[in-house]
């Protein structure tokens, strides 16, 4: 009889545990989904900020070209557009600013506006590494950067990443100066101010892993 009671208790405990796990499985799945969604949201926000910075810098370059070709009105339009992109209050610039170990302006915020990934200069080709690079390229084409990097790491391929950093405060000030100078029809000086915005970009190179 005791054995029967004990067996009944164990069965009841196991049954309740199964129900508890079943009840909590959707919660765990929901939490995981929320984490994935938050990660995707953060990545999308960072990408949007980088795009705004990159578009602003392209506007600066084309504005200088417009001045060179004698089209100050176009230069003014592009400069205003670049300034608007960097003054967007809805963008959380500080949240995605890169803490700079190599930056030369301590009171500024550096924004990653572009990046490139390449093979280390010390790379020596082997059939295995060539195959890994091919697979990595396929994964990169599908947007799987993490998988591509892991493929190269496992194959012992050294990878370097170059990040192009824009000093936000300095660039905003340079654009404000350029706008004032364009309004005064001081086009040579405006071009120099725009050049100053371009020259503020720095490149931060980092070895993701070495071979």
From Swiss-Prot:
Residues 1-21 form the signal peptide. Keywords: Signal. Induction: By EvgA. This is Protein YfdX. It comes from Escherichia coli (strain K12). The lineage of its organism: Bacteria, Pseudomonadati, Pseudomonadota, Gammaproteobacteria, Enterobacterales.
């Amino acid at each position: 009889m005791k054995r029967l009671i004990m067996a009944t208790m164990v069965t009841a405990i196991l049954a309740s545990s199964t129900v508890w796990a079943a009840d909590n499985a959707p919660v765990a799945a929901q939490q995981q989904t929320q984490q994935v969604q938050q990660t995707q949201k953060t990545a999308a926000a960072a990408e949007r900020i980088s795009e705004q910075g990159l578009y602003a810098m392209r506007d600066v370059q084309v504005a200088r070209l417009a001045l060179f070709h004698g089209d100050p009105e176009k230069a003014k339009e592009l400069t205003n557009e670049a300034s608007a992109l960097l003054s967007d209050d809805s963008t959380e610039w500080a949240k995605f600013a890169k803490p700079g170990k190599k930056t030369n302006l301590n009171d500024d915020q550096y924004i990653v506006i572009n990046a490139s990934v390449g093979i280390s200069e010390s790379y020596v080709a082997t059939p295995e590494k060539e195959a890994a690079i091919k697979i990595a390229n396929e994964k990169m084409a599908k947007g799987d950067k993490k998988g591509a990097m892991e493929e190269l790491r496992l194959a012992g391929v050294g990878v370097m990443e170059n990040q192009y950093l824009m000093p936000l405060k300095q660039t905003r000030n340079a654009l404000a100066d350029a706008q004032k100078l364009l309004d005064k029809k001081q086009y040579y000086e405006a071009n120099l101010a725009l050049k100053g915005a371009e020259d503020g970009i720095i490149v931060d190179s980092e070895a993701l892993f070495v071979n």
